[in-house]
C-alpha cells in the first residue's frame, strides 16, 4: 500500500484544531470533485427530448441537390462544421445547419469534420443524419484528427498537456481551439452546428459577428488563410488559458483579441479596423440568447422576410434550446426556418418526429 504524501502527513500531525480543519477541507474538496465527476460521467448532457431514437438508418435522397464542386479536400474557401465529441449521429438541427449551408453555397465544399468518424477507408456509420447529408454532393464528412489539426500551431503543446487532465468544459474548449486552427491553416468559413444559413456568405472575408454590445462570438468566422488575427487568437488561447470559465476561450477570447487588434477598450469604439470587421448582432444573432424561446413561438409567415432582412444566418442557441419540442408543421419560427432553408431535413422531421 502506497504511503500518503509527506505534506499530508505533516498536516495531519498538527494540533487537534488544525487536524479538524485540514480533514474538513480535504473532505469537502473530495466530495465536490466526486460530485462533479458523477454528474459529468453518469448524468451527462441533457437528452434531446424532441428527437426520437427509433430513426431509420437511411433516407431516400431528393431529386434536386446542389452541383458537385470540381475540387476535393480542404482548400481555401471551404465551409467547415465541427463535432469534437465522439458522436456520429447528427440531430435534426445539425442536419439543417449543414443542408442550409450546402443549398446556399452550391459552388463550395461543405466539410463536416467529426472526431468520432473512423479514419482510412472505413465506411461511414449508418445513421439517418449521415445518410441525409450524404445526399448533397458538395457535402463531405471527414474524420477529425485533433493532434494533426493542432500540429505546427501554438495549440499543439496545449493539446498534449490537456489530454492528461479533466476539465468541466473540455468539449466546447476543444471546439474553440479547433475553429481558430482551421481558419489559420485553411481559411474559409466556420459555422456552429446550430446555425440555419439564409444567404450566401462568400462575400464575407475577415469577418466575425457581434453577439451583444459587450462581446463577440465565434459561432461564425470567415477568414483568409493564415491571417494574423487568427494567429493572435491562437497565442492568446495558450497565454491566457483558463478552461474553468465558460466562454473564456471562445467569445471572451475573440473580444479580447479584437480590442487589442484595434487598440480599443469598448466594442462600441470600432466595428472595423486593420482589415477585420465585426458585423452587428442582426447579421448572425438576431435573437439574443436570453430570448431563445422566441424560436418556438408562432409568427405570421409574411413577417419572416422583414424580420430577417439583415440576417445572413440564424443562431438557434442549442445550449439553451436543446430538448424543446415543436411541431415541424407549425407556424413556429424555427419550424418555418426549417421548411424554407433545409426542406429535406424538414421532410424527415415531419415523417419521424
From Swiss-Prot:
Extract one GO molecular function annotation from the record.
galactosyltransferase activity
- State the compartments where it is located: Golgi apparatus membrane
User: What is the predominant subcellular site recorded for this chain?
Assistant: Golgi
Looking up InterPro entries in the UniProt record yields: A1-4-GlycosylTfrase_dom, Glycosyltransf_32, GlycoTrfase_DXD_sugar-bd_CS, Nucleotide-diphossugar_trans
Q: What does this protein do?
A: Catalyzes the transfer of galactose from UDP-alpha-D-galactose to lactosylceramide/beta-D-galactosyl-(1->4)-beta-D-glucosyl-(1<->1)-ceramide(d18:1(4E)) to produce globotriaosylceramide/globoside Gb3Cer (d18:1(4E)). Also able to transfer galactose to galactosylceramide/beta-D-Gal-(1<->1')-Cer. Globoside Gb3Cer is a glycosphingolipid of the globo serie, one of the major types of neutral root structures of glycosphingolipids, that constitute a significant portion of mammalian cell membranes.
Q: What's written under domain? A: The conserved DXD motif is involved in enzyme activity.
Family designation: Belongs to the glycosyltransferase 32 family.
- Output this protein's name: Lactosylceramide 4-alpha-galactosyltransferase
Q: Which species does the entry assign this protein to?
A: Pan troglodytes (Chimpanzee)
What gene is this protein translated from?
A: A4GALT
Amino acid at each position: 500500500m502506497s504511503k500518503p504524501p509527506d505534506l499530508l502527513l505533516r498536516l495531519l500531525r498538527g494540533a487537534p484544531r488544525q487536524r479538524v480543519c485540514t480533514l474538513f477541507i480535504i473532505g469537502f474538496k473530495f466530495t465536490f470533485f466526486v460530485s462533479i465527476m458523477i454528474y459529468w460521467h453518469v448524468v451527462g448532457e441533457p437528452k434531446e427530448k424532441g428527437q426520437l431514437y427509433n430513426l431509420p438508418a437511411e433516407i431516400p435522397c431528393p431529386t434536386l441537390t446542389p452541383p458537385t464542386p470540381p475540387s476535393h479536400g480542404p482548400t481555401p474557401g471551404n465551409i467547415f462544421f465541427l463535432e469534437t465529441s465522439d458522436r456520429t449521429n447528427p440531430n435534426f438541427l445539425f442536419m439543417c445547419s449543414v443542408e442550409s449551408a450546402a443549398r446556399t453555397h452550391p459552388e463550395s465544399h461543405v466539410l463536416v469534420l467529426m472526431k468520432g468518424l473512423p479514419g482510412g477507408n472505413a465506411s461511414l456509420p449508418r445513421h439517418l443524419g449521415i445518410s441525409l447529408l450524404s445526399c448533397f454532393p458538395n457535402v463531405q464528412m471527414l474524420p477529425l484528427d485533433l493532434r494533426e489539426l493542432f500540429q505546427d500551431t501554438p495549440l499543439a503543446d496545449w493539446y498534449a498537456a490537456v489530454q492528461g487532465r479533466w476539465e468541466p468544459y473540455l468539449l466546447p474548449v476543444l471546439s474553440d481551439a479547433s475553429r481558430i486552427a482551421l481558419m489559420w491553416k485553411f481559411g474559409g468559413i466556420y459555422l456552429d452546428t446550430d446555425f440555419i444559413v439564409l444567404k450566401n456568405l462568400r462575400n464575407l472575408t475577415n469577418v466575425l459577428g457581434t453577439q451583444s454590445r459587450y462581446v463577440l462570438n465565434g459561432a461564425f468566422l470567415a477568414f483568409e488563410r493564415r491571417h494574423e488575427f487568427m494567429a493572435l487568437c491562437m497565442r492568446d488561447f495558450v497565454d491566457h488559458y483558463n478552461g474553468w470559465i465558460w466562454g473564456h476561450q471562445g467569445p471572451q477570447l475573440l473580444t479580447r483579441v479584437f480590442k487589442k487588434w484595434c487598440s480599443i477598450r469598448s466594442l462600441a469604439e470600432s466595428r472595423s479596423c486593420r482589415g477585420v470587421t465585426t458585423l452587428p448582432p442582426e447579421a448572425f444573432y438576431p435573437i439574443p440568447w436570453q430570448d431563445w424561446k422566441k424560436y418556438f413561438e408562432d409568427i405570421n409567415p409574411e413577417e419572416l422576410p422583414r424580420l430577417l432582412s439583415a440576417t445572413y444566418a440564424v443562431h438557434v442557441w442549442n445550449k439553451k434550446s436543446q430538448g424543446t419540442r415543436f411541431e415541424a408543421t407549425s407556424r413556429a419560427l424555427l419550424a418555418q426556418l426549417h421548411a424554407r432553408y433545409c426542406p429535406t431535413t424538414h421532410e424527415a422531421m415531419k415523417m419521424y418526429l
